Regions:
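Active-site neighborhoods and metal-handling regions in enzymes and metal-associated proteins
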Residues: 1-226
Length: 226
């Protein structure tokens, strides 16, 4: 389910399943919102006879592909979010899958985590440089598993001759490598992923070293290998 469980429905986690955590915080200089899905143990492959909807690894990879496809998109200025929203769903649609929540929402500055009117719904305002929004495709199987990958992005001007826009991802947390089926990713998606990991290393690595968090630093290096 895309919603948090109640105290009455919570149960003990096991190493044989995925865990989705949607987290964030309010700070004087901004608000954060991020979702990662991880697997505690060994992940089985996604080869037949399992359909993608019963194969968590393939489903996760398709959600990640949607996140990447929308995050790296270049689009004309004044484009409405609802116009490009399908890029986040395309990889899932290719397998006959979908999700039942919005693809993203505006982020407040020490205000609402979900802030109107920025986002990817049909009634949101056109995207403009300087706006922050989330990109968070997902996939859910009630009683089995849930997947969501959420990053916060800044709308910026693209390096094009005409007035176009693109997104700059400001969430710097690696994805779970065990859940990624590289055979499904295009060369462009792999290049994007490697570039994103280089950015995480460059920005987060030195801070972990400064705080002498060596175990966290080693985890970061391992999690961001090309």
């Amino acid at each position: 389910s895309p919603r948090s469980p109640s105290n009455g429905s919570s149960r003990t986690l096991s190493v044989g399943e995925m865990y989705l955590f949607d987290t964030g915080g309010q700070y004087l200089d901004g608000t954060t919102d991020i979702t990662r899905t991880v697997h505690w143990g060994w992940v089985s492959g996604c080869s037949p006879p399992a359909h993608p909807r019963h194969a968590p690894k393939e489903a996760y990879t398709r959600v990640l592909m949607g996140n990447i496809d929308l995050s790296r998109l270049v689009f004309p200025s004044s484009t409405a979010g609802g116009t490009v929203e399908a890029f986040a769903r395309r990889a899932l649609w290719d397998a006959g899958l979908n999700y039942g929540h919005g693809t993203g929402h505006g982020i407040g500055n020490f205000l609402s985590v979900h802030e109107w009117p920025v986002g990817f719904q049909s009634n949101n305002v056109p995207l403009e440089a300087g706006m922050f929004t989330s990109i968070e495709p997902g996939y859910y199987r009630d009683g089995e598993f849930g997947i969501r990958i959420e990053d916060i992005v800044l709308v910026v001007e693209a390096q094009t001759e005409k007035p176009f826009l693109t997104f700059e991802v400001v969430s710097l947390v690696p994805y779970d490598r065990k859940l990624i089926d590289l055979s499904l990713l295009s060369p462009e998606q792999i290049r994007y992923l490697n570039s994103y990991y280089e950015k995480i290393r460059a920005h987060v690595g030195p801070e972990l070293r400064r705080q002498r968090l060596e175990e966290a630093y080693e985890w970061l290096q391992e999690s961001t290998e090309p």
